Every structure is written in C-alpha cells, then in structure tokens.
C-alpha cells in the first residue's frame, strides 16, 4: 500500500527564500542568500574545472566568517520554553559530518535509529530555553538529511516548540512506525532507542539537501538560451475554442517579448507584448538566468488556423509557426498521450514520429515525469529541444509526476514552464485542473499533492459535466503489479464508478498494462460497467519481471510507446504504437 501523505512543497520552499534579510555585508543572511553570494563569487573567481572538483574542505576553507556562521545557524531554528536535549539523527552513510556539528557542542552517542533503508547516528546537545539554531546538512546532496527529536531536560516540564523555521513544522511522537520525510512518508522508523521514544519528532523533507548543495553540484546545459527565441511551446489555460497560450525563452538580454499572429487567409496581423519571467537555476553554470515568456491569446475564432512568430522589437524573431483552435461544433478529434518520458532524446524522436503518423492529432499530453529532475532547468532544455517543432504546432499538456515535483520541494519549475488551466482545486492551480474538449471531460490530477484536498473538487467536476466521455489522467496508477495505490483505489475509485469515468491514464512504472473494465475493485465484462485503467511508458522500460495482473486485458514489458485516441461522437478508438510505428495494442469503446 502506498500512502500519499505528502507535505505541500511550498512551505518548505520558504527555507530557500526566507530568514534574515540582506541589509549589509556584516549581517547574517539566510542559507539561501548565503549560498547565492557564494555561488556568485565562485563564478567570478573560479573556472568550470574548479567548480567541478570542489571538495567539502575546500568550500569550508573558502567561506567568509559570516557566511560560515549563517550556514551553521540559519538552517533550522525554533524557540523552546524550557531547557531541552536536542537529538540529531544523522545518516551513517553520509561521508562528511556537517562542519558545524561538533564545534557547536553536539556529541555523538552510542545510540542508533533505523528505518528499512538507513541507519542514523544519534548526536545530542543540551540547550537552555530560548532559540535553538542549527546548521546545514552539508555541501553534498545527501538526500536522507538529518531530523530531530526534542525532550525537556526536566521530565516534569511541558515542552512547547514555537515558532519554527522553516514554517509549518510538523511535529509528532518519536516512535517506531513514525515517518521522518514528508516526501517519502512510506519510509517509517523500525528501531528507536527506548530512551528516545515519546519525544517530539521534528520531521523534514529530503529536498533540504539541495539548500547548500555545492559539491558535485554544478551543471551545464547542452542547450543554453540565446537572444533568438526558442523552445516554442503551445498550451491552453482557457477555452481551447477561442484561446491559445504561446511560450518561449530567450537569454536575459531580451527585456520584452512580442508575438505577431494572424488568421490564415487574412492580411491583418495582431500583436501582443509580454514581460518575461526571470528563471534562475543558480547551479547551471553556463545559463544561470534566462527569460521565459508567455503570451495568452484570447478572442480567437473557433476552428481556425493561425500563423504566428515570436521575438522582440530589438531582437531576433522565430520562424513562422502555426496553430489551430478547436471547433465549436461537434466533430471527431484525436489526441496522443505518453507515460513517463524523462526528457529522453528517444522520446523526442517518438513524438515527432507520432506527428508524422497521426497528422490530425490536435494535442498531446504526458502523464507525469516529464523530466528526470524537476528543479534542473537543463533537463527541461532537453525535453523541449528534443520535442522539436512538434509542440510549437500542437498544444502540450501534462500532469506532474514525482520526478517533476522533487523531494518535497514542489513543482515550481514545472508550473513556470507550462501555462495550464486554472480550473483547479484551491491552491493547486496549474497542478490539478480540468478542461473540456468537444464532448470529452479531461481531469488532470496531481497525485503528488494530497488526495483528500482534491476529492470534493473532483466529484464536483464530474457531477456537473454533461460530457459523453470522461478521462482522468494522473501519474500514479491505482492498479499495477509493482505497488498498488490502494489509497487512490479507495478514495477515488468509488467516484470513478459513480460517474462512469471511462479511462484512467497513468505511468510511473515502466511497462505496459491495460486493464479490463473495473468497478468496485472487480473486473466487469462490459466496458460500460467499469473503468479501464491504463499504464504506458514513453521512455526506457523497466519492471520486466512483473507477474501477470489478474485484472489485465493486455500486459507486457515495453518502452517508447505512445497512444493515439480518436473520439467520434459515441465511439472511442484507441491504439498503442511503438518506436517502429507498429501497432501493439488497440481497442474500441462505444456508448
């Protein structure tokens, strides 16, 4: 059983942006500000070869006194009302002990804490009442970061911990069965020393390893931005009948963006000027900053073809591209979907082949894991570059996967890369959303966010829809042969049954499976009586030794597949195609 008790990443992103403010060189800064300054200085003073060979000791020796103090005190802070003993659990596999740990008075004890994978040393220090200040996990990206347990030195005292930085700190009882990482809450403690049990456990996320990541950290993109617009991408954030969103990027030299667009056959050219979003990836040494533009075209004519180009008054322009709006009247339409693609060059070949083989396709979507690492902009550069001009002619939509929403830090880069509908649960705009295309309702759900906070919205959209076909798309497949998501089955399965959702599309596991119709957890003979759960893979395959699933209609090891679906009134025709253009599965549904 897989739990999805994930903490919303934005409260942890605050750790990268908040804390002491930068007013003068002699003031303590936040960890984020401190690392920003260090990285900027590194770029100015050291070449790429040096950046690629940095060691923990070299970095520590290069720190200025206030930088070192900030990194030793501003990572985790809280107030305690009584004297406490702080226990710090550090993964034994971490090669380098945090530079500040021993010098600040922490001492290693003989105790150990364990979960199914990691064994942690227990370090302890006594603190008086007042503020407790702790330092970074280290300069490496060691993902099982340290976590804390607190106990009053006087057992009769009642301990209160407040306020805490980062904000929204979760505190629970330190015990066997407790989780420590919100982005992996299925990983629970298996051994806790008796003397520590019942203390206050301060949980964390593995993404905190990235806050001071400098060793083996610097990257280069194969496709840096330039003054000429590239990465042209079409999406929707409103009605597909009368709107389109055009996105592109340039270097930071281009201060304003502009799109020229025209209805084909017309001599009238319209234009829209847009401001950039400045996107930083501070460890991307050859393209730290770039500008990303989004032009939202509205008031377009239904079922019409348009030409467009993007650029700026003072800079270069793209080649002319084209798009079409959706028809306002009921007509047949086709779309293509992919499972995980992981910014694969082979997937780029696959989507371009799919366009040639299915030129009538009106849009594409990816069921999560668009990239390997959602916070690495060089991975996004690969994704868009490998897709080529395909996504500048037909819209690309998506839902986030666990790789797009990295280590509990949220999917902010995904959100900035893709302009998506805001018809969403509160606070989940662009992550979970719905849109209707012709006679089909698409429910695009982000299951890396809490399910319970989306359930009422999901049911409301289904209850209000008069669409003939209903298709749900999300990354984690409820039915699979590796690790079934019983929480999705239990919470959303009855809703899919109640409103007769036709297809649930997903990925995550790298093989192919199309279920028989399922209702109330049981296989049904007639597709009209159940939902088909469908897993596919758009990149390299894995999971080759999965036993045959009892509910599977079709199942096989696979890689580099796409699915083309055509909806014509009350008929849905689907086929799965491999990289060689061969059909490997097909079926037809009718209403």
Can you say where each PLM-predicted feature lies in the sequence?
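Bacterial Sec-dependent N-terminal signal peptides
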Residues: 1-24
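Structural beta-strand segments of beta-rich domains
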Residues: 74-76, 84-86, 242-246
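Noncatalytic modules at the cell exterior or secretory-pathway interfaces
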Residues: 124-138
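Acidic, histidine-bearing metal-coordination/catalytic regions of metal-dependent phosphoesterases
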Residues: 158-337, 558, 567-591
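Extended active-site neighborhood of metal-dependent phosphoesterases/phosphodiesterases
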Residues: 294, 305-322, 379-466, 491, ...
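Active-site neighborhood of phospho(di)ester-bond hydrolases with catalytic His/Asp-centered motifs
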Residues: 337-339, 363-369, 395-402, 445-446, ...
């Amino acid at each position: 059983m897989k739990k999805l008790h994930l903490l919303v990443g934005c409260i942890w992103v605050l750790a990268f942006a908040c804390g002491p403010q930068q007013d003068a060189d002699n003031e303590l800064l936040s960890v984020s500000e401190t690392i920003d300054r260090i990285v900027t200085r590194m770029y100015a003073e050291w070449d790429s070869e040096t950046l690629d060979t940095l060691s923990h000791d070299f970095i520590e020796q290069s720190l200025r006194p206030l930088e070192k103090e900030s990194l030793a005190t501003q990572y985790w802070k809280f107030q305690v009302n009584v004297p406490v003993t702080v226990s710090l659990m550090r993964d034994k596999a971490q090669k380098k002990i945090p530079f500040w740990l021993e010098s600040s008075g922490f001492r290693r004890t003989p105790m150990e804490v364990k979960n199914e994978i990691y064994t942690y040393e227990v370090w302890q220090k006594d603190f008086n009442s007042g503020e407790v200040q702790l330092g970074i996990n280290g300069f490496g990206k060691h993902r099982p970061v340290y976590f804390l347990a607190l106990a009053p030195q006087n057992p009769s005292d009642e301990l209160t911990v407040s306020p805490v930085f980062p904000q929204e700190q979760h505190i629970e009882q330190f015990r066997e069965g407790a989780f420590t990482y919100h982005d992996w809450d299925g990983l629970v403690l298996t051994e806790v020393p008796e003397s520590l049990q019942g203390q206050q456990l301060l949980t964390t996320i593995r993404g905190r390893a990235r806050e001071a990541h400098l060793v083996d950290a610097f990257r280069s993109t194969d496709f840096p931005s330039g003054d000429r617009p590239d990465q042209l991408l079409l999406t929707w954030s409103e009605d597909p009948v009368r709107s389109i969103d055009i996105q592109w990027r340039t270097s930071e030299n281009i201060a304003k963006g502009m799109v020229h667009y025209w209805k084909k056959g017309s001599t009238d050219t319209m234009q829209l000027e847009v401001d950039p979003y400045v996107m930083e990836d501070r460890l991307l040494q050859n393209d730290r900053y770039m500008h990303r533009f989004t032009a939202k075209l509205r008031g377009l004519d239904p079922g019409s073809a348009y030409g467009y180009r993007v650029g700026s008054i003072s800079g270069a322009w793209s080649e002319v591209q084209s798009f079409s709006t959706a028809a306002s009247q009921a007509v047949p339409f086709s779309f293509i979907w992919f499972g995980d693609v992981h910014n694969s060059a082979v997937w780029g070949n696959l989507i371009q082949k799919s366009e040639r083989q299915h030129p009538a396709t009106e849009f594409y979507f990816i069921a999560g894991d668009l990239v390997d690492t959602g916070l690495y902009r060089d991975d996004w550069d690969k994704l868009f570059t490998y897709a080529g001009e395909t996504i500048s002619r037909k819209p690309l939509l998506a839902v986030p996967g666990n790789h797009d929403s990295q280590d509990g830090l949220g999917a902010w880069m995904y959100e900035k890369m893709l302009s998506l509908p805001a018809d969403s649960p509160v606070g989940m705009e662009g992550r979970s959303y719905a849109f209707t295309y012709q006679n089909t309702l698409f429910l695009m759900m982000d299951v890396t966010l809490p399910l319970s906070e989306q359930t009422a919205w999901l049911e409301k959209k289904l209850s209000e829809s008069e669409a003939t076909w209903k298709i749900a798309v999300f990354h984690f497949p409820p039915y699979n042969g590796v690790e079934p998501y019983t929480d999705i089955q239990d919470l959303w399965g009855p809703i899919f049954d109640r409103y007769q959702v036709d297809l649930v599309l997903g990925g995550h596991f790298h093989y192919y499976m199309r279920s028989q119709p399922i209702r109330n957890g049981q296989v049904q003979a007639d597709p009209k009586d159940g939902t088909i759960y469908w897993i596919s893979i758009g990149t390299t395959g894995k999971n080759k030794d999965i036993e045959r699933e009892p509910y599977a209609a079709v199942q096989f090891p696979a890689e580099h597949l796409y699915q083309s679906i055509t909806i014509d009134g009350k008929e849905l025709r689907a086929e799965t195609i491999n990289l060689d253009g061969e059909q490997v599965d097909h079926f037809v549904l009718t209403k």
